[in-house]
């Protein structure tokens, strides 16, 4: 049975006009988001992750241009909406959790009132008393202890982890169908990160919302996401289920991300990094954007952009290494071990 799609992104392109020229920040990005599922978008800084999510919220800067693409939500192309139409959807049907809770909260407003604010905005008949009652319930749902005592606190009185819980409560206030989380745990320590991720998974199951989770850290999404899109230089270079990306990765950039992840049982003395820097998107390179950093690059990588090769019906990668004519290459021992584990997983099914 096919999953219900709540969002379809098709051939999205986003440019930014600058004095130096047009920055081609997003190039031909497509993906689907299914009901109750989590899609993780992973990549280095500057890969286009945050621009993608801001486009989904209609929050790009004024110098942004979208020359091509569709964002289909409930049969409507969000790119056709006027700002007043966006305001009915933003924070209501589609909500966002931002990276830094301190800059997301108004330091001069009590936290309970900030949580109640979107309720009053999107429910015109709701009284302030009912909104505050619901705000208290939301604070309890996101695990804020003694919520009734702290509902009138100001943001500076709370720790970073508690502030992030408040931001999540605000995002969940209207029971959104889609929740976009832009690196929501980056500013938190590892223990609090795990608590926030666990809480978000529980809340998702309870309200059956769909999540787009942005991160630069593949390790964060291992036990949380259903599907993963790996972004590089404004493009999705690999897309698959979380198991396919972790245990059967096919793109050299994905290999590099996985090799740079620390693991508890690793015998490696030092972490591996991906050499070089991402390309200048004012003038994207000819061919494969990752070619200059790819030690497995073929001659064709510098001349012709690769298509998406199908690895499975749910798994695609944009690399010439998957062309039947390409030579076989040997990635790191880490990737070979993952491939071996993939064969074992397939055998268990």
UniProtKB/Swiss-Prot annotation:
Q: List, alphabetically, the Pfam families matched.
A: ABC_tran, oligo_HPY
What are the residue boundaries of the ABC transporter domain, all occurrences included?
A: 7-258
Which one GO biological process term can you cite for this protein?
Answer: peptide transport
Q: Looking at the record's lineage, which domain of life comes first?
A: Bacteria
Cellular component GO terms held in the UniProt record: plasma membrane
- UniProt cross-references to InterPro entries, sorted A to Z: AAA+_ATPase, ABC_Ni/Peptide_Import, ABC_transporter-like_ATP-bd, Oligopep_ABC_C, P-loop_NTPase
What's its job? Answer: Part of the ABC transporter DppABCDF involved in dipeptide transport. Responsible for energy coupling to the transport system.
Record-stated family: Belongs to the ABC transporter superfamily.
Binding partners and assembly? The complex is composed of two ATP-binding proteins (DppD and DppF), two transmembrane proteins (DppB and DppC) and a solute-binding protein (DppA).
> Which protein is depicted?
Dipeptide transport ATP-binding protein DppD
Annotated gene: dppD
């Amino acid at each position: 049975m096919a999953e219900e799609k709540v969002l379809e992104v098709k051939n999205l392109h986003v440019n930014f006009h600058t004095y130096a020229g047009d920055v081609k920040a997003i190039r031909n990005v497509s993906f689907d988001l299914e009901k109750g599922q989590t899609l993780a978008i992973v990549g280095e800084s500057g890969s286009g992750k945050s621009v993608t999510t801001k486009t989904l919220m209609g929050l790009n800067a004024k110098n942004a241009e979208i020359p091509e693409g569709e964002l289909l939500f409930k049969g409507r192309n969000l790119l056709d909406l006027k700002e007043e139409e966006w305001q009915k959807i933003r924070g209501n049907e589609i909500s966002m959790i931002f990276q830094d809770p301190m800059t997301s909260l108004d330091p001069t407003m009590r936290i309970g009132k900030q949580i109640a604010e979107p309720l009053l905005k999107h429910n015109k008949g709701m009284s302030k008393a009912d909104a505050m009652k619901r705000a208290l319930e939301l604070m309890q749902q996101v695990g804020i202890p003694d919520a009734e005592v702290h509902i009138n606190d100001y943001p500076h009185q709370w720790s970073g982890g508690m502030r992030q819980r408040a931001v999540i409560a605000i995002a969940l206030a209207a029971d959104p169908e889609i929740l976009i989380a832009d690196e929501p745990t980056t500013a938190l320590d590892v223990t609090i990160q795990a608590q926030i991720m666990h809480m978000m998974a529980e809340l998702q199951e309870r309200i059956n919302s769909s999540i787009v989770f942005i991160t630069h850290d593949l390790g964060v999404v291992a036990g949380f996401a259903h599907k993963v899109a790996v972004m590089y230089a404004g493009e999705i270079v690999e897309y698959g289920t979380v198991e396919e990306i972790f245990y059967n990765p096919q793109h050299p950039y994905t290999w590099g991300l996985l090799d740079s992840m620390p693991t508890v049982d690793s015998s490696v003395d030092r972490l591996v990094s991906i050499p070089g820097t991402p390309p200048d998107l004012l003038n994207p390179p000819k061919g494969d954007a990752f070619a200059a950093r790819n030690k497995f690059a073929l001659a064709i990588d510098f001349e012709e952009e690769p298509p998406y090769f199908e690895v499975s019906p749910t798994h695609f990668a944009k690399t010439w290494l998957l062309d039947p004519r390409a030579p076989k290459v040997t990635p790191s021992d880490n990737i070979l071990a993952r491939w071996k584990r993939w064969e074992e997983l397939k055998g268990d099914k």
